[in-house]
């Protein structure tokens, strides 16, 4: 699994909104650094941490912190990710429309945990897929050949999606998946931990 082009947005507006109930905007002490990163001041960070720990009714502001990221992952992982439908959007590369557009190679598939015997068999599957693809391209794009590719395609095939989500969704994912048996979820949780103020606003680890 690979994470690229991560962007965290709207932190300033989310923190300002968190102060609306108490009209305490005068206590805001955050600012942008020279690189354009929004740095929370002590007052704002203290408020954000207290609201985060007070429960979902009090931490509405975390739903207003948005994240965009390009994730490349195998189809078997996307099947699990797709259970998170609330406050997530994803635009994916099209398997149906573009599967034939370039040669198949073993690196199109997640195979890092395969035994040597299974990897050798996987090479024959990839070879068969490429033979079907060439037949499809050279013999008039017959639907039978297209179906052969689609139905033979292993769930380890890697797909890239541009995903958007918010910090509340990431709280739910982090605590539901951090002990999952799939290594991809452990990588996902480490990516979450790398986000700005993830320790305080998502993981909310005790000091």
Report the location of each language-model feature.
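Family-specific signature for flavin-dependent thymidylate synthase
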Residues: 1-207
């Amino acid at each position: 699994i690979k994470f690229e082009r991560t962007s965290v947005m709207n932190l300033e507006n989310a923190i300002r909104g968190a102060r609306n109930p108490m009209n305490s905007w005068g206590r805001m002490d955050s600012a942008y650094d020279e690189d354009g990163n929004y740095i929370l001041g002590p007052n704002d960070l203290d408020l954000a941490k207290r609201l985060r720990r007070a429960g979902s009714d009090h931490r509405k502001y975390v739903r207003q912190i948005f994240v965009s990221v390009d994730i490349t992952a195998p189809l078997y992982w996307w099947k699990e990710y797709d259970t998170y439908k609330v406050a997530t959007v994803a635009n994916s590369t099209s398997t149906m429309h573009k599967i034939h557009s370039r040669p198949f190679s073993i690196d199109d598939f997640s195979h890092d945990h395969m035994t040597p015997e299974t990897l050798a068999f996987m090479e024959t599957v990839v070879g068969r897929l490429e033979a079907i693809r060439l037949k499809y391209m050279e013999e008039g794009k017959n639907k039978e050949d297209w179906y052969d590719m689609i139905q033979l395609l292993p769930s380890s095939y890697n797909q890239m999606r541009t995903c958007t989500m918010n910090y509340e969704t990431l709280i739910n994912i982090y605590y539901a998946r951090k002990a999952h048996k799939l290594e991809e979820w452990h990588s996902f949780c480490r990516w979450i931990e790398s986000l700005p103020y993830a320790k305080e606003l998502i993981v909310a680890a005790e000091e």
